[in-house]
Regions:
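Conserved Radical SAM active-site core
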Residues: 1-176, 180-183, 215-222
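Acidic-histidine catalytic/liganding microenvironments
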Residues: 6, 200, 293
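A glycine-rich phosphate-binding loop feature that marks nucleotide/adenosyl-phosphate handling sites
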Residues: 115-122, 211-216, 251-267
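A conserved active-site cap/scaffold subdomain adjacent to cofactor or substrate pockets
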Residues: 176, 187-209, 214-220, 229, ...
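Long, highly charged, low-complexity intrinsically disordered interaction regions
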Residues: 221-292
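Short alpha-helical segments in extracytoplasmic peptidoglycan/chitin-binding modules
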Residues: 290, 303-304
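Residue-level signature of tetratricopeptide-repeat
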Residues: 307-308
Length: 310
């Protein structure tokens, strides 16, 4: 709090391991959030990690107190989750994730905003973008809503105090995290899962965490296994291509070529495999075509288009 008052920090990440049981742990997190927002007047950014299996009312209360809420997937497939975390299931993770999505959409609609997050809208006009209306229609993302909204979710918001105004539900959206290297899934599986999460659950971000071996276990990599930091980096680059460059998972990888080349960034690797699309005429190429040129990003592509003389 002193760091916040002195302007050393602008936000914080709040997380916890399970203490006693999920309900008790989530209750303590909500109490902490309420103390920060009310007693200590912490109006900065708060990212809170939820506890799978906690009651709906506690998860909803956390959403009204925090700016961003995370329901961590941890592993990309139900098989790996069952193998490495048998106490968890896809159902206990995806159900609250769907409720967060629908409650965010409902509260955004009530104040006159689009139900989907703005980040999605910034990419909607790129042909083939995973956030485009046509892609959302094909994947069923637009019709995959309903039935999981927290009814009367606003009633779970903590009571306001004199100078404390009620907040929107998770205004910075929701995110999740996947561990890289703990199970044997390919990069293709990871990127496909990421794309589905963005489309079906309107996630703001998917985070990746390289697995660091710390325990001897036959189901886990050996202790001397190198930490896949470069692989994690390539997945973040691919994630960026999905969100801002109009790429799709099937363009970057395939079942025949399931893993990224760790010695080359995914966009450059794609360009080398599609030399028939190059060179391009910079003066006439469309914005989405410019985005596929290695070394050109959204800002540069926008400047090139604006600088043209007709």
């Amino acid at each position: 709090i002193e760091f916040y008052k002195r302007n050393y920090i602008e936000g914080l990440f709040l997380s916890s391991g399970v203490i006693r049981d999920p309900a008790y742990t989530m209750e303590q997190i909500c109490i902490t959030l309420q103390l920060l927002r009310t007693k200590y007047r912490f109006n900065g950014y708060i990212h809170v990690k939820t506890i799978p299996g906690a009651p709906d009312e506690l998860l909803a209360a956390a959403g009204f107190l925090a700016d961003r809420i995370s329901v961590n997937l941890e592993l990309p497939t139900a098989e790996s989750l069952k193998k490495l975390a048998p106490n968890k299931s896809f159902q206990t993770i995806m159900t609250p994730m769907g409720k967060v999505r629908d409650t965010i959409a409902e509260t955004r609609t009530l104040i006159g905003k689009d139900a989907r997050m703005e980040r999605s809208l910034g990419n909607r006009y790129l042909p083939g973008s995973i956030f485009g209306k046509e892609q959302l229609r094909l994947t069923g993302a637009q019709s995959n809503r309903g039935g999981s909204l927290w009814k009367k979710a606003a009633s779970f918001a903590p009571a306001t105090q004199d100078t404390w105004k009620p907040r929107a539900f998770a205004p910075a959206g929701q995110s999740t995290q996947m561990i890289i290297g703990a199970s044997d899934e390919s990069d293709y599986t990871l990127v496909q899962t990421t794309q589905k999460l963005y489309q079906n659950y309107d996630l703001k971000r998917v985070f990746y965490s390289a697995y660091i071996p710390v325990n001897e276990d036959s189901a886990l990599p050996a202790l001397e296994t190198p930490v896949p930091l470069l692989r994690e980096h390539r997945l973040y680059q691919a994630d960026w291509l999905l969100r801002f460059y109009g790429f799709q998972a099937d363009e970057l990888l395939s079942e025949e070529r399931p893993n990224f080349n760790v010695r080359m960034d995914p966009k450059c690797d794609w360009a080398i495999r599609h030399l028939e699309q190059f060179p391009i005429e910079v003066q006439t190429a469309s914005y989405d075509t410019l985005l596929r040129v290695p070394g050109i990003g959204p800002k540069s592509a926008g400047r090139i288009v604006k600088a043209r003389r007709y």
